[in-house]
Amino acid sequence: MSLVKLESSDEKVFEIEKEIACMSVTIKNMIEDIGESDSPIPLPNVTSTILEKVLDYCRHHHQHPSPQGDDKKDEKRLDDIPPYDRDFCKVDQPTLFELILAANYLDIKPLLDVTCKTVANMIRGKTPEEIRKIFNIKNDFTPEEEEQIRKENEWCEDKGGN
């Protein structure tokens, strides 16, 4: 079991099994490019707090792999988040968004999928006003602009009939 060292943006070094670290395509490519080394792999876009959470996620999924299903079908389902992942994503919004950015940067598709599904579930069924409130977004449209947008997008409104 070989170990690799990862260095967060705030210069904290983590030592982890290479096999687990390689769940990140970015890290796997870095290891392939630079070869095995005692020097830590720098991850300038990930803080130690977030990297620690990401590594916890990777350790768990390395020990408890998810059953392989039909990826295309699973990607579209928002309500099929496994219990561990659901609990993992029960964090404050800034942390959730940092996890999304880290998963994207590190190219860990399952983590990116579950964090994005979590955000999608946060806004499912909400009005634009409710979504603005959830994400603290200022509405900078005039009432006239808003009405025009509503008219242009009437076709995609859910009218309650399935």
From Swiss-Prot:
The modification 4-hydroxyproline is found at P143. It is found in: Cytoplasm; Nucleus. One of its GO terms (biological process) is sorocarp development. The modification N-acetylserine is found at S2. SUPFAM superfamilies: POZ domain, Skp1 dimerisation domain-like. The keyword Glycoprotein applies. It holds the Pfam family Skp1_POZ. One of its GO terms (cellular component) is cytoplasmic SCF ubiquitin ligase complex. Keywords: Acetylation, Cytoplasm, Glycoprotein, Hydroxylation, Nucleus, Ubl conjugation pathway. Residues 100-162 are annotated as: Interaction with the F-box domain of F-box proteins. O-linked glycan consists of linear Gal-Gal-Fuc-Gal-GlcNAc. Glycans are attached at P143. GO terms for molecular function: cullin family protein binding; F-box domain binding; identical protein binding; WD40-repeat domain binding. There are two genes coding for Skp1, they only differ in a single position in the coding region. Belongs to the SKP1 family. Multiprotein complex (SCF) with cullin and F-box-containing protein. Capable of undergoing aggregation. This is SCF ubiquitin ligase complex protein SKP1a. The gene is fpaA.
